[in-house]
From Swiss-Prot:
One of its GO terms (cellular component) is cytoplasm. This is Nucleoid-associated protein PSPTO_1265. It is found in: Cytoplasm, Nucleoid. It comes from the Bacteria. InterPro entries: Nucleoid_associated_NdpA. GO terms for molecular function: double-stranded DNA binding; single-stranded RNA binding. Keywords: Cytoplasm. Coiled coil: none annotated. Pfam families: NA37 (PF04245). Belongs to the YejK family.
Length: 333
């Protein structure tokens, strides 16, 4: 993963309305294995993060100047350090306007993954721990807690520059503590939601369930195709990449590679050609499970409404086509 430019600044800020203090670095970080490891760990943590949103820049304006500074940097009008400096100064001002915000180390990293250029921006915090030194003494230790990302965004620079119709070249963490906590960071980037990741994922799963039903697939085949969909979606999510409908269709049925894709288009589900996979929605699709005293139930979601009927009023499940192994045990009781 080639790292083109990387820099870290520090903003000291407490959530009590006191002014934010900026400690800006005046040069880029030199290339090192530590930087590569940090960025790799950051990407892994970011990709695994649930609750992300996808969108695009607001039109450049006084309220949303970041995209203009980024374009100026990419066009050669600003070097990376100057771009990051003017950006972090803007972030500092927005932090001061938000009483709920806290400071931290602000990372800017322009890197390449495959043929795609990305800009990652994250507000990082430290965790206190312990370490054993060369003299085998236990000593206090501080490290960047990359596993606890709350404010971060990633811009697909290549998508932004080459696909003017795209509405999902920015991904960002929405924040689980409520909109106000992360609103200032979204304003800093100047982005608006363009794609409803959970909604698009739910629609895709509905289209898949309809497809399985329309094809009248045997249970084993339906299970295999479900696993293929979940595995592909999970793999794309882990890499931070969207699901491509055509690629997914080819994986689901190698003999009829366009069958699922044509089903989606013919039924007009309104899905985008590429969908950001929402992990929480995918996890809910995998299986329904429940336990009670002496009872354990687990079944794949696509069976609901087909081999499994749920009566919410009566609080009952009706299971059709019991497994042979289970019926044999019941007969021998």
């Amino acid at each position: 993963m080639p790292i083109r430019h990387c820099i870290v600044h520090l903003i000291e800020k407490k959530p009590d309305g006191t002014p934010a203090v900026l400690h800006a670095r005046d040069s880029e970080l030199a290339e090192s294995q530590a930087i590569e490891n940090m960025l790799a760990d950051l990407n892994e943590s970011y990709n695994a993060k649930q609750g992300k949103a996808w969108g695009l820049f607001h039109p450049e304006s006084g309220a949303h100047p970041f995209s203009g500074w980024l374009k100026e940097y990419l066009d050669g009008g600003k070097d990376f350090t100057a771009f990051s400096r003017v950006s972090v100064e803007h972030l500092q001002k927005l932090m001061e306007e938000s009483n709920l915000s806290v400071g931290g180390h602000v990372l800017f990293a322009h890197y390449q993954q495959g043929m795609t250029d990305y800009l990652a921006i994250a507000l990082l915090h430290h965790s206190d721990g312990v370490a054993v030194n060369a003299e085998l003494d236990v000593t206090p230790s501080r490290h960047l807690d990359l596993g606890q990302l709350h404010l971060a965004a990633r811009i697909n620079i290549s998508e932004w520059q080459n696909n003017k119709q795209s509405k999902q070249y920015i991904s960002f963490i929405k924040g689980k503590n409520g909109k106000k906590v992360s609103e200032y960071f979204r304003d800093f980037i100047g982005c608006q939601e363009g794609v409803d990741g959970p909604g698009e994922t739910r629609t895709l799963l509905k289209a898949f369930s309809d497809f399985v039903e329309s094809e009248d697939l045997p249970e084993e085949s339906a299970r295999e195709k479900t696993k293929t969909l979940i595995d592909y979606a999970s793999s794309q999510s882990k890499m931070g990449e969207p699901m491509g409908l055509e690629a997914l269709s080819e994986l689901i049925d190698e003999n009829q590679p366009r069958a699922f894709y044509d089903h989606i288009r013919n039924k007009d589900y309104g899905l985008s050609p590429e969908i950001p996979a929402d992990k929480r929605t995918l996890n809910q699709f995998r299986r329904f499970t429940g336990r009670a005293e002496g009872l354990s139930i687990s079944f794949e979601a696509h069976l609901l409404g087909d081999k499994i009927e749920y009566d919410e009023t009566a609080g009952t499940l009706i299971i059709k086509g019991l497994p042979t192994q289970l019926t044999d045990q019941l007969k021998r009781r």
